[in-house]
Design a protein with these regions (language model features):
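Short intracellular "coupling" helices and adjacent cytoplasmic loop segments at the cytosolic face
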Residues: 118-131, 142
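Alpha-helical transmembrane bundle of multi-pass membrane proteins
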Residues: 1-117, 142-440
């Protein structure tokens, strides 16, 4: 193996993966209907983990070839990815473009056509709903352009030139969401699961296939999120995930310690029982994570940013993931070496910390259109309850205009994004008031 070429290839691979991580969730959220947006992204992660499972077992099987000395062990898994990439490159040509991106580019006729194909336009009522949704997107895009200038990545990070849209706050939320995702323990469990099983007293050979089986359970658990994420919302999904994961991590650490003590005392039967209990807790942790925290930190960045900078905003989420994942990947070996099973207690504590953070700082986005979500961040306060109060106030202040069968009035109780949007624009900013007139 040429190490220099392998490192170079890994850098190129990582660059491409980063692009896909930034684009795919945005594309999914912009093409999906608001009532099933979470479901679409959750399905994406089910397939993502399926790829992880295939990769793990492929490498595990190849490791036995040629007594572990043949170059086939690493050449075949690398080459196996090439047909997948060719298929992806060919299929992308047939994917529909995001209607919201087309509106942003001024290609409204194309956006209308694609939106009709995505939502269905077989009946007169369907066509009216499609047209109303398109008008919501157009007016939201016009509002965003009139209220803040084009932003660079640094502008987004520090919130400059964003006015009432508070893009700096949104960037901080998505970056820390991804860092939290890694610190709740998944980086340690997925990458260093064999080490955790070693703490529980398992042999090296057994650790490998137990870790692979854990990935299989991980994949199937993501299906839970497909059916629950849009029903109970993003916040409650994280709540119950943090509780389940925290308990599982604490018990895994406890059982690992008991197993080590039993083995030191010469009681191999008890050591094996405690070790199996620790493995069960790791399985439970991974399953709960797959059903909850795996998807939400990737979905949230794709939802909360304005259309003008949505792709850039999701890129900041990828930055947060890279920081959290890279940090823990380097730190975990040191933590396990010096702290042993106590590392799992740290992960348990991090799960507990995430609950008040989500409650206080992260407004709910479920069952809201991407255009309406902008109003959640019109409040000058960082607290989520203030954002909800401000949203309700904006809706009360504006009169509901008689629009052409508005999607919002047709699919939810009478509320108008346009009326609220006008109220946002009427907010005083630096002593001036901007009036936005709804065009009926």
């Amino acid at each position: 193996m040429n190490h220099s070429w392998m490192i170079c290839a890994r850098l190129v691979n990582g660059w491409g993966t980063g692009i896909l991580n930034a684009i795919v969730p945005v594309w999914a959220t912009e093409t999906a209907e608001h009532k099933s947006r979470g479901q679409f992204v959750a399905i994406e992660f089910t397939l993502n983990i399926l790829g992880v499972v295939i990769a793990y077992w492929l490498e595990y099987g190849c490791s036995f070839y040629g007594n572990g000395e043949s170059s086939f062990i690493w050449r075949f898994p690398v080459a196996f990815q090439i047909p997948m990439l060719i298929c992806l490159a060919a299929m992308v040509l047939f994917f529909p473009e995001s209607p919201r991106w087309l509106v942003k580019m001024g290609r409204e006729d194309e956006a209308r056509y694609i939106l009709g194909r995505l939502r269905g336009d077989s009946s007169h009522e369907d066509k009216e709903l499609v047209e109303a949704e398109l008008q919501d997107i157009i007016e939201s895009c016009q509002y965003e352009r009139s209220n803040f200038r084009r932003q660079t990545y640094l502008d987004m990070l520090f919130g400059t030139r964003s006015g009432k849209l508070h893009t700096g706050r949104r960037v901080q939320l998505v970056v820390w969401f991804q860092i939290m995702q890694e610190w709740i323990g998944i980086a340690g469990v997925t990458i260093y699961a064999p080490t955790i099983f070693g703490i529980a007293g398992m042999s090296p050979a057994k650790r490998q296939w137990i870790a692979g089986l854990n990935n299989v359970f991980y994949m199937f658990s993501t299906l839970i999120c497909v059916f629950t994420l849009d029903r109970i919302g993003r916040r409650w999904t994280c709540y119950w995930g943090s509780v389940g994961q925290g308990i599982a991590m604490a018990l895994a650490g406890g059982f690992s310690k008991l197993g080590q003590d039993a083995r030191a005392a010469g009681d191999l039967s008890k050591a094996s029982s405690y070790g199996n209990a620790a493995v069960a807790m790791v399985y439970i942790f991974t399953s709960v994570f797959g059903a909850t925290w795996l998807t939400v930190p990737w979905l949230y960045p794709a939802e909360i940013f304005p259309l003008e900078i949505r792709a850039k905003g999701n890129t900041w989420g990828v930055v947060g993931w890279s920081i959290g994942n890279g940090w823990l990947t380097l730190l975990c070996p040191i933590m396990f070496q010096h702290l042993g099973e106590k590392t799992l207690y740290i992960f348990a504590a991090c799960n507990a910390i995430t609950i008040p953070m989500i409650w206080a700082l992260y407004p709910e986005t479920s069952q809201r259109t991407l255009e309406e979500i902008n109003l959640l961040f019109a409040s000058d306060s960082i607290w989520s309850w203030e954002a909800e109060k401000n949203l309700a106030l904006l809706k009360e202040q504006g009169e509901v205009p008689e629009r052409r069968n508005s999607v919002l009035s047709a699919r939810r109780p009478s509320s108008s994004t346009d009326a609220a949007r006008g109220s946002v624009a009427r907010h005083h900013h630096k002593g001036s008031t901007v009036e936005v007139e709804s065009k009926v």
